Design a protein with these regions (language model features):
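Cysteine-centered motifs
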Residues: 3-5, 10
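Non-catalytic accessory regions of SAM-dependent methyltransferases
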Residues: 22-71, 75-78
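Conserved hydrophobic residues forming the short capping helix/wall of the S-adenosyl-L-methionine
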Residues: 46, 137, 190, 264, ...
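Conserved AdoMet
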Residues: 60-136
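Short loop/edge segments at beta-strand edges and connector loops
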Residues: 103, 201-202, 278, 302
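Conserved SAM/SAH cofactor-binding pocket of Class I
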Residues: 125-232, 259
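Mobile active-site "lid"/loop adjacent to the S-adenosyl-L-methionine
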Residues: 224-256
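Conserved Class I SAM-dependent methyltransferase catalytic core
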Residues: 250-313
């Protein structure tokens, strides 16, 4: 490329190639961002209210900026490195990646849990299940030594097992999963939050047949979404959260519940209790399955949104 200016020739292409770093830096420094613009960038994925909450969380957790700070122009005062970091995070949000994975943590039961791709992000419904177990824990008989032994099957981030260990201090809590990532993240969260949890790699579908009256409580939030339901799921969940922790075959939606419940028939102590978070579409079927296995005092509860979501059964 060649241009002529006031009779002087200049090689524009050579100039751009030689000075591209300077020009790029100059351009990025001139970019101005405001809160509304950030929200608009992800409004095609989330509704405006949720998009606003996500951007607020991102700015607060990653840059220490409150909404008041942002309204007072704090975005314009970000350093060049911070601006680049924010832009990178926004690009990830635009691709549908959950904000919890981007900031590396999620709130659960008043605590912050480390999360990363490969473990499910804790949900509010699971907090309700934990509350139910905590409320009934005083009525659960311990073993001969007075201890109460709790098992979390499919621990994921450890949100259930770690929380129960902290909320029920007289309990000895163990956690199973088949994912190296899940076991590592659970261990990380237990250490960070000061909880004592024994962590094991164990497949729920191949639980030890020789276990006899080990546990006072078994709790699980296993995979329960049928493959056919995937088309109704949100993009950020479907494309980014681990499918092995979400889905079961359409032909056998109770696969994990049945396996864990069968294990519980011999691994739970007399008077022991089984707690499940369930697929809202299969509440009655899950109750019937538990009855057929000999469980009693079965209770099906709805979550805060009015959906069948939790079951407790006694043995």
């Amino acid at each position: 490329m060649y241009c002529s200016c006031n009779g002087l020739g200049c090689d524009l292409q050579g100039f751009l190639l030689h000075h591209w770093k300077f020009l790029f830096t100059f351009a990025t420094r001139k970019i101005k961002m405001n809160f509304k613009q950030l929200v608009n960038r992800i409004s095609g994925i989330y509704d405006e209210r949720e998009a606003s909450s996500i951007v607020k969380m991102l700015l607060e957790e990653s840059f220490g900026l409150s909404f008041v700070d942002v309204c007072l122009g704090a975005l314009d005062k970000l350093s060049e490195d911070e601006t680049k970091s924010l832009e990178g995070m926004m690009l990830r949000l635009e691709k549908g990646e959950p904000v919890q994975y981007i900031i590396g943590r999620a709130d659960f039961y008043g605590r912050q849990f480390a999360v990363e791709p490969g473990v499910l992000i804790p949900r509010p419904e699971t907090e309700e299940l934990v509350t139910w177990i905590k409320e009934e824990s005083k009525d659960i008989r311990g073993n001969r030594n007075g201890k109460k032994y709790l098992l979390d099957v499919g621990c994921g981030s450890g949100c259930i097992s770690v929380t129960l260990a902290l909320e029920i201090p007289e309990a000895e809590v163990s956690a199973w999963d088949i994912s190296d990532t899940a076991l590592r993240v659970t261990k990380k969260n237990a250490k960070a939050l000061g909880a004592s949890v024994d962590i094991y790699m164990q497949d729920a579908l191949n639980a030890p047949s020789g276990d006899r009256e080990l546990w006072n409580v078994i709790v699980s939030n296993p995979p329960y979404i049928c493959v056919k339901e995937a088309e109704d799921m949100e993009r950020n969940v479907l494309e980014h959260e681990p499918h092995e922790a979400l889905f079961v075959p359409d032909a056998d939606p109770l696969l994990f519940y049945r396996a864990i419940a069968e294990y519980g028939t011999h691994a739970l102590c007399r008077g022991g209790r089984l707690y499940f978070e369930i697929n809202r579409a299969y509440g009655k079927e899950t109750v019937k399955m538990l009855e057929m296995l000999g469980y009693h005092d079965i209770e099906l509860r709805k979550d805060a949104f009015g959906n069948d979501r939790m079951i407790r059964a006694c043995i």
